[in-house]
Amino acid sequence: SNLRRQRQMCIRDRLITVSISDRVPGWLENSDKGWLTAEYNMLPGSSDQRISRKSFEGGRSKEISRLIGRSLRAVCNLGIINGYSFTVDCDVLEADGGTRTASINGAWIALNDTFTKMVNENKLVQNPFTCKVGAISVGIVGGELVADLDYAKDSNAEVDLNLVLDEKFEILEIQGTAEGKP
């Protein structure tokens, strides 16, 4: 039987759900490991201009989905979740800049809550997270260093940088772009 359960939380303008399955992908069968992945989407009405659902199939959503999944797996002992697959869905209700970093932060919280509940129910022997994860966007706007860029600042930034860090401030992921001279 396929165990399917969802935990939901809303962080500011993002809805994060965690779905659990008692199956792992075929390539992980007989490996003594579970799996953890993520999917990211912006709802059609989340920005000033409606976003077509067809655009969600494009590269940006997939790239952000992979970023979220990699960030979570970087601090997860997949051996502890052996036999389970977890899918974290990050849906943006209102886009205001910083959606990927907010989604990473919310995804870690939702998944940590899920793991804690499963430990309390004796479905996991311990929480598989080895440490906390946090993400932040930073940039240079008008020559000034700015943290947590909103849409207006992000669209005018000379440098836009997303950092994913663990609780020891070790860098797990870095993404950056520059307009003109960085």
Please annotate each region the language model reported.
Residues 1-7, 11:
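Single conserved hydrophobic/aromatic residue that forms the stacking wall/gate
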Residues 15-52, 62-63, 67:
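Active-site cofactor/substrate anionic-group-binding motifs, chiefly glycine-
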Residues 17, 24, 65-74, 82, ...:
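Conserved alpha/beta core surface patches that mediate binding of polyanionic ligands
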Residues 37-39, 69, 79-95:
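Glycine- and acidic-rich phosphate- and metal-coordinating loops
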Residues 46-84:
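Ordered, amphipathic secondary-structure segments that act as subunit-interaction surfaces
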Residues 66, 87-118:
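Conserved mixed alpha/beta catalytic, RNA-binding, or beta-rich assembly cores of soluble enzyme
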Residues 80, 98-102, 112, 116, ...:
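A structural signal for small-residue-enriched, beta-sheet-centric alpha/beta enzyme cores
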